[in-house]
Regions:
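Peptidoglycan-targeting cell-wall enzymes and recognition modules
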Residues: 2-26, 30-31, 47-139
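Short, well-structured alpha-helical segments
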Residues: 22-25, 39-46, 141-148
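GGW-centered surface loops in extracellular recognition modules
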Residues: 28, 36-37
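Active-site or metal-binding loop neighborhoods of secreted/extracellular toxin and effector enzymes
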Residues: 131-153
Length: 153
């Protein structure tokens, strides 16, 4: 997989970013069982969201509300993620963020902030997105766009 890294990063930083990206891709592929095209699509989104650092602790620039691999926003998905971690006895790690994304994509997260027990993304979005990401006939471009449009927005 071709891993983009920030322009101007030192060789040491580039090595760290590539290591982190490969770790995340491995978790998506081997632990969470996403097909290769979906992994490429999700990784493209993570790259953009983190400025190609692939750092699960990434904070949005200029003090914005985005946090983590998916730049979950404080007051929105980030708060739902915090509740999900507490309910599942997890701590904030790259794996936890990926597991939360996986649960949300499957509609099994139960982290809706005002309607406890419901999926954060509702019912229709997970049904569509989960099907799209596991359809090995879909192109990387389609999976990238579907993930961006349905999960990130």
């Amino acid at each position: 997989m071709d891993i983009k890294v920030p322009f101007g990063a030192t060789e040491k930083q580039k090595a760290i970013y590539r290591r982190d990206a490969n770790f995340i891709a491995s978790l998506l592929l081997n632990k969470l069982k996403y097909p290769p095209n979906a992994v490429a699509g999700i990784m493209a989104n993570i790259g953009v969201e983190t400025g190609h650092t692939y750092d699960f602790k990434q904070k949005q620039s200029k003090g914005g509300p985005g946090r983590g691999l998916f730049q979950m926003e404080i007051g929105g998905m980030y708060d739902a993620y915090q509740g999900w971690m507490k309910a599942n006895n997890k701590r904030d790690t790259a794996l936890s963020q990926l597991e939360y994304m996986d649960a949300a994509v499957k509609g099994k997260d139960g982290s809706h902030p005002t309607d406890k027990g419901r999926a954060y993304l509702g019912t229709n979005i997970p049904r569509y997105l989960n099907k799209s990401l596991h359809d090995e006939l879909n192109t990387v471009d389609k999976m990238t766009m579907d993930f961006r449009d349905k999960f990130e927005n």
